[in-house]
């Protein structure tokens, strides 16, 4: 294969059978359980990279069920998103995500810079309870519960919240182990079609784990819980800050 052919075909590895396809990446019946909780402000400031700013000691803990996604298939995801601001623009900084499907792990890390790791999350309805769990190996590190569809939320308002800015710290090492890419990336969810939104009483329990340290941001108080169902497109990203260029 000539170098020109390599350049024209290069998208993802392996070259002849990429781990994930080109987009657009559309999700149908994407289901969220988002539990917002109050945590320790000092710990947030220690882990959120500047120039992002933390204004409130809040964390969104998410369990996301994706039964139908373009190229990525049927999988579930769980993790923590921290409300932040970038130059006055509010958004969410994804601290870590844990999922059970290789293509979105590879694609998420390589394309956008999603901090994804392999684990075993679930989101299901158990009689009258929406139940989210995260297992890392044999260890249960997160359990979230919410009363099933106790009260409807405004669909337009929830669509606007989903459409807000999202921020990622994309890191790709060079072959010598130094940083080749170290960028702050912004992306948006697009073409959002809300199908349902509810709230109810909720609980969240986090357990310590060396490799899935969700409990490093302790739950001090539950602030809000949302159960959302939507179709949406995961938009590609843009670099808003290059750490290596500074």
From Swiss-Prot:
Catalytic activity: acetoacetate + H(+) = acetone + CO2
Superkingdom of origin: Bacteria
Main enzyme class: lyase
Coiled-coil regions listed in the entry: none
Keyword Lyase: yes
Family matches, as Pfam families: ADC
Keyword set includes Lyase: yes
Protein name in the entry: Acetoacetate decarboxylase
The encoding gene: adc
């Amino acid at each position: 294969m000539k170098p020109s052919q390599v350049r024209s075909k290069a998208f993802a590895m392996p070259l002849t059978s990429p781990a994930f396809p080109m987009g657009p990446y559309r999700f149908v019946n994407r289901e969220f359980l988002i539990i917002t909780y109050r945590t320790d402000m000092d710990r947030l400031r220690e882990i959120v990279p500047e120039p992002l700013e933390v204004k409130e000691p809040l964390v969104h803990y998410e369990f996301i069920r994706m039964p139908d996604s373009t190229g990525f298939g049927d999988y579930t995801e769980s993790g923590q998103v921290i409300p932040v601001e970038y130059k006055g623009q509010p958004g969410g900084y994804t601290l870590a995500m844990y999922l059970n499907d290789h293509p979105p792990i590879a694609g998420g890390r390589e394309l956008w810079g999603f901090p994804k790791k392999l684990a075993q999350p679930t989101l299901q309805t158990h009689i009258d309870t929406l139940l989210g769990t995260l297992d890392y190996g044999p260890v249960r590190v997160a359990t979230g519960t919410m009363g099933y569809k106790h009260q409807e939320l405004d669909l337009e308002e929830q669509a606007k919240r989903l459409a807000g800015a999202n921020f990622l710290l994309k890191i790709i090492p060079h072959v010598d182990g130094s940083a080749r890419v170290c960028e702050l990336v912004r992306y948006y969810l697009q073409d959002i079609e809300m199908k349902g939104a509810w709230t109810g009483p909720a609980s969240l329990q986090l357990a310590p784990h060396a490799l899935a340290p969700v409990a490093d941001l302790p739950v001090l108080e539950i602030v809000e819980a949302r159960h959302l169902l939507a179709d949406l497109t995961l938009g590609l990203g843009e670099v808003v800050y290059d750490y290596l260029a500074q």
